[in-house]
Each structure stands twice: as C-alpha cells, then as structure tokens.
Amino acid sequence: MSALARAVGISRQALYLHFPDRTQLMLALVAHVDEKEQLQAGIAAVTHAADAAGAIRAWAHMQTWHNPKIAALARALDETWHADPSASAARADRMADRMRGAVSIIERLRAEGRLDPTWTPAEAAVLLGELTSFHVWDDLVNDAQIPPDRYIEIITAAALSALGAPVSRVT
C-alpha cells in the first residue's frame, strides 16, 4: 500500500481512509475498470438476446471488445492470485460474476430444450465459463491470431455443439 500511495502521490494514511486493506483496494480496482470499460453494456446485450444461442454469441462478442481493455489487469491478477490473497479475492469476485452469467445462459439453454440432459447445469456452466474465459480468448485471438469475428463464431459453435451433445457418464 505504501508503494501505491507514493506512486499516486498521496500518503499511505490517505489511501487507508478509502481502502482499509489491499483486498478492498483490489476489489474496488476491478469494479472501477469494469465500470470504466462499460461491462454492463455487454452484459445487457447478453441478457436481452432473443435466445440462449444469441446470448452465447453476445457473450463471445463482449469478450472481443472488453478483453483488450482489461488484458493488462487480467494478466496481472492471473500471475499473482495464487500467492497474493488480495489478488485472489479480486479474481474470485470476477469469476463469481462470470459463473452467474454462465448459469443464467445455461438455464435459458435448458429451458429452450437445447442442453442435452446428460449435462448437469453445473458442468454446463463451468464449460461455458471456460470457453468464454479470458484465457481462451487470449490464446485464440492473440496467440493463434484468429480474427475477433471468427472467434465469436468458433466459441458460439463450440459451446452449442458441446452442450447439445450427450456426455457419457464414467462409473
């Protein structure tokens, strides 16, 4: 906290007036970045999609414009969350929000009869969350150089194909 206070030109005490600890600071930081980068507009597009397939497509689309704006912060949290409880709390907060979004889409998919009954809702939500994760976007768009529009189509098709297909149960 001392280094951060020095970097922004305030006293450590002034920083603690606003944030009682690093965890609260990290949570405020990720919330601020999401607000500044208009994450709610992307979430609204997902929520208001005509059907579950449209919601998956809207979520993938949101990744193509939101992730470049948060890439530095997402990578920093990813590098530090295992060892830093404050970064871990900020990451857990974001992941919980993502999982709520995935669960909502899976509920729609199931209500529309497009989720194969061999999937549990929890398994399906985890898969959808992973397919639309920052890591998958980063690997496909940045490392593999897949154009963003193609990424949207690949993620949408992969999610719909996987979740509409039966899963064998291992006994």
Residue ranges and their predicted role:
Residues 1, 30-37:
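Short, basic, alpha-helical segments at the C-terminal edge of helix-turn-helix-like DNA-binding modules
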Residues 1-24, 28:
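Helix-turn-helix
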Residues 3, 24, 58, 76, ...:
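Amphipathic alpha-helical interaction segments
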Residues 19, 79-84, 131:
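Short helix-capping/turn signature of helix-turn-helix
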Residues 22, 29, 33, 59, ...:
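Hydrophobic/aromatic residues within well-ordered alpha-helical segments
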Residues 24, 28, 41-69, 125:
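Hydrophobic alpha-helical connector segments
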Residues 64-78, 85-112, 122-126, 160-164:
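Amphipathic alpha-helical packing segments from all-alpha helical-bundle domains
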Residues 110-158, 166-171:
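Hydrophobic/aromatic-rich alpha-helical bundle segments in the mid-to-C-terminal region
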